[in-house]
Amino acid sequence: MAQWFNCTSSESSVVNESELILTSLAGILMLGVGSQWIAGRLKIPSILILLCAGIMAGPVTGFIDPDQLLGDLVLPIVSLSVAVILFEGAMTLRVSELKEIGRPLLMLLTLGVAITGVVCAAGAYYILEFDLTKSILLGSILTVTGPTVVGPLLQHIRPIGKVGPLARWEGIVVDPIGAVLAVLAFAGAQAMESSKLEDAAFNGVFGFLQTFGVGAALGVLAAMLLRVMLRRHWINDHLQNPFVLMMVVLTFTASNLLYHESGLVAVTVMGLVLANQHQVAVGHILRFKENLSVLLISSLFIVLTARLDLQQFANFGWRGPAFLALVILVARPLSVMLSTIGCGLPINERLFLSWLAPRGIVAAAVASVFALKLGDADKFVAAAFIVIVGTVVVYGLTADWLARRLGLSIANPQGVLIASAHSGARAIAEALKKLNIPVQLVDTNPSNIRAARMEGLPTLFANILSQHIHDLNLGGLGRLLALTSNDEVNVLAAGRGAELFGRKESYRLGINSTGASRRDASSGMLEGRVLFGPGATYQELDRRFGEGQVVKATKLSTNFRTTDSCRNTRPP
């Protein structure tokens, strides 16, 4: 009887432990995705809601204990997740943008990183009273910025000029640089404490070159292998996304095994090369990785913030805010203003970049990984999270205002993104241009693009449905006109316009089809507001321009009727 009772009790504890694990995992997923949804509804940086949710679930209520839940798996899971996030970020970069931003980007990634690291390390040493090793390590980690925070901010602000692509490139490329610097700084600081200054300097430079050399080489090889396999259709369509994910994990792991901490470099280079080749389409891969990254970022922030010790924040006292002020008011402005001297950037763009360096998931992950190698790890992680939370709050609440004050953003942009560059679309664009309204024509037809360029209209040879539209310089643009000859494309483009500018500013031509599409259109089930009225289909627009009708601009008044402008006027 006693034996039976012990057996039953043991089985019950196993069941309870299993249920606890399941509840915790479900809670992480629910809090992560739910926080993203709430942030999207409130139009605030999602990291703020994620941080609050993680703190409430972890140190406040004890609902989630990542160390008990995942044990030794915490750091490997964090590392692999960051690798996938950086791969996805690198796939949004376009090498063609380097023609305009190459020089300032190079200076930001070299001199700018060095200045940021030195100032932050000095602040950690003198303000936070860290020892030399921790100070140098924290300074290296804080050289990174948060692409997962910068991206949404840029989509909201839509700055004009070079600052948009420059901030995106810096945010993604500097992350593996910062991670590698942290590894080398940790080893170098330990060597310096052992009075091996010459060895520390030599090993640091040599290790940096080796890390980037091994990582870049393996990243290029992996991307080229994937390109060949996709081009020759060696991978079934339904397996392409999971296969690429497997390749990312394999490349990251293999690179780290070949040379310590070179994996992040490898996956970043892999994503960059894969995105900029022109032999196979990778749009579907990018969309899959974007969805996966959202899930990973959400879960990671919940896990990492749930591990925080809130008492460590209180222990800093005035030193925490003082260190944050140094990072925001001294380190970033100093690094940008000095590193961009003579790079051709206007002063307003340099000032804006000086106020845009939020830290995000990479800084949190790297700090959490290295904290286990240090004594007093909770204090080190708390210092990193002070900067993460502080920079997100400060930049998230003020960057939009500063961009408008500097003339880099418009509160109510009137520019128009036109999907298609056929003759009718060009006529509308020309009329808008004469009114000094910015226009941008997007088309995949080379003939239409050439004709638009010959007429002096800004053009982009791209698919309006491509995810890369999110990464364009949309400064001054505030609405979309979907004018293609395909009703379905117009509806989908209107959906993309709603993502960029909001549903209110997304327009499309009327539906010409009958049956289900007509019923959907009349019931409001289709995306986009109908431009000019339901009868204004592409066929009707094409007929009118074919008859010689032209586009004219007329000031509205109480005596003016819209029908007065609809005249069958032939051009002289």
Regions found by a protein language model. Give the residues of each.
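Cytosolic regulatory regions of ion transport systems
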Residues: 345-346, 363, 369-572
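Transmembrane helical cores of multi-pass secondary ion antiporters/exchangers
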Residues: 2-412, 465
